[in-house]
A protein has these predicted regions:
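Alpha/beta-hydrolase fold catalytic core
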Residues: 1-64, 89-90, 132, 309-311
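Conserved alpha/beta-hydrolase catalytic His-Asp/Glu region
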Residues: 26-31, 35-36, 172-173, 177, ...
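Active-site loop/oxyanion-hole signature of alpha/beta-hydrolase fold enzymes
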Residues: 50-51, 58, 97-137, 303
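Conserved HGGG/HGGXW glycine-rich cap/lid loop of the alpha/beta-hydrolase fold
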Residues: 58-102
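Short glycine-enriched nucleophile-adjacent loop
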Residues: 143-154, 160
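Flexible "cap/lid" loop of the alpha/beta hydrolase fold
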Residues: 151, 160-188
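Short beta-strand/loop motif that positions the catalytic acidic residue
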Residues: 251, 257-259, 263
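Catalytic active-site module of serine/aspartate enzymes centered on a nucleophile-bearing elbow/loop
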Residues: 281-284, 288-311
Length: 311
């Protein structure tokens, strides 16, 4: 009996430690920047230099410009599912935010100000690409950057679309990032992030995890494991820096807020707060949809964008 109990204890210990073994004993998953650029660029890819960093964006279609801004841990590929009809009618520009996708972080100094850096980056994009009149669409953290852009550039941002946007009480999100405040956690990812971690994180963004396509989390994992990206994301998460929510009230342009009702990341109640604080604001709620409506409900999202832009 004692031998059986001892065996069971050892078995439980092995099972408990198996995930750690997978993390620490796995091969190096980090993808060198040059290789990532070669293998993950698109035919519409462009690269520009800003503050010593190489930054990636895509430029497709003709017509009135639409700028798409992804969220934390994502890339411009997050918008790939939007119907081709959007690109057939508009000039669609997608950016990899600094520190994500194929974009580097610029030089930040000893006391980096991440919110201001992203504000400056969007200003740079608007000026460099001559976007003197533009519609801006942002998801999650990218939504927060989008409404900052609308407040900063009321003369340029003519319409704003927020998809499950960051903006208000972020304790639900920041609490999940608490572990990243410890620098020792970063060493767990010295060899990259296993694909099962990307899968687990992305499935939480869907109302129905079975709708998440394996190709999506594999691609996301490649971008996450691009040289430098994990440490950039960890640094951003540790900073716990968030924009001043009072700035939302400065948004003047017509705004469409789209929200998946089953968002497990940012509660749907936040949509009402945007409605309250932005004077010219319409809210559209999607059933059977989580945190990324442009991925889980791409057809409905595209239709809503086209209708709003045509008004």
């Amino acid at each position: 009996m004692k031998k059986l109990v001892g065996f069971l204890i050892i078995l439980v210990a092995v099972v408990a430690l198996l995930p750690l073994a997978v993390v620490f004993l796995r091969p190096n998953l980090i993808i060198p920047k040059a290789k990532a650029k070669e293998e993950l660029s698109l035919p519409s890819s462009h690269f520009i230099n800003w503050r010593g960093a190489e930054l990636h964006y895509t430029d497709e279609g003709t017509g009135y410009p639409v700028l798409l801004v992804h969220g934390f841990g994502g890339s411009l590929r997050n918008f790939s599912k939007l119907d081709d009809s959007l690109r057939n009618e508009y000039r669609v520009l997608r950016v990899d935010l600094p520190g994500f996708g194929l974009s580097d972080f610029p030089e930040m100094g000893k006391h980096p100000q991440y919110v201001q850096m992203y504000r400056d980056y969007i200003s740079f994009i608007l000026d460099t690409l001559h976007l003197d009149s533009v519609y801006v669409v942002g998801n999650s953290m990218g939504g927060g950057i989008a409404w900052l852009a609308a407040a900063d550039h009321p003369d340029k941002v003519r319409k704003l679309v927020l998809l499950n946007s960051a903006g208000y009480d972020v304790s639900n999100v920041s609490g999940k990032l608490t572990m990243f405040r410890f620098k020792s956690v970063g060493h767990v990812f010295d060899k990259g992030m296993p694909v099962f971690m990307s899968e687990s994180g992305l499935k939480k963004c869907y109302s129905d995890p079975t709708k998440a396509n394996p190709d999506t989390w594999v691609l996301n994992n490649h971008f996450t494991n691009r040289e430098g990206n994990i440490q950039n994301m960890l640094a951003l998460a540790r900073s716990q820096q968030f924009p001043d929510t009072n700035i939302i009230k400065q948004v003047q342009c017509p705004t469409l807020v789209i929200w998946g009702k089953q968002d497990h990341i940012i509660p749907v109640e936040h949509a009402k707060k945007f409605k309250r604080d932005i004077k010219n604001c319409t809210v559209l709620l999607f059933d059977s949809c989580g945190h990324v409506p442009m991925q889980e409900r791409p057809g409905a999202t595209t239709a809503a964008l086209r209708s709003f832009f045509a008004e």
